[in-house]
Amino acid sequence: MSIQNSLPDYQSFDETLHQQSVALTAAEMHGLISGLLCGGNRDSSWQVLVHDLANDGLAFSHPLAQKLRELREITFESLDDSNFAFGLLLPDEEDNVFERADALAGWVNHFLLGLGVAQPKFADRKEISEIIGDLRNIGLLGYEEGDDQEELSQALEEVLEYVQVAAQLCYIAFTEPKTVLIAKNDKPTLH
């Protein structure tokens, strides 16, 4: 099973969030968690940050908290994967293209929120400033109900690919790969 295929089912996860009275969609939650990870957040503080940003500072129920931990772990593994397996949690391709466009815009906006919380001065980084500008524009994604759905679908796929690469570039800019961290931790201790 590929890492991409191990993301939860969008509709099911979205319903779980709604049932728990979380104001974020599944796409927005995944964007937020992805942004925190890409900003270099590696410790358990991510949970408190997600509580603050998505649930008025209140902890989630145990079942939802477990699903969020699993989502974070899958996302972390996919970002750290050398095969670039990172994917976005969005509605299925068979779903309405307008819903997918809205979900992508929500994912991007919450990704930028998470990135900004983890890296408050991310805009100062020259190597990613253009990417951040592009993501901000994508977050404002708009369409007309009368737009050709086929054209919009093709454009959406291109933008989606760009967002995936942009997120991975942010991850590379702000974090060290897991293998480097493991190597640092495995250094012998000098007594």
From Swiss-Prot:
Lineage of source species: Bacteria, Pseudomonadati, Pseudomonadota, Gammaproteobacteria, Enterobacterales
Similarity field: Belongs to the UPF0149 family.
Assigned GO CC terms: cytosol
InterPro entries per UniProt: YgfB-like (IPR011978), YgfB-like_sf (IPR036255)
Listed PANTHER family: UPF0149 PROTEIN YGFB
Endpoints of the signal sequence: none
Pfam families for the chain: UPF0149 (PF03695)
Protein name stated in the entry: UPF0149 protein plu3602
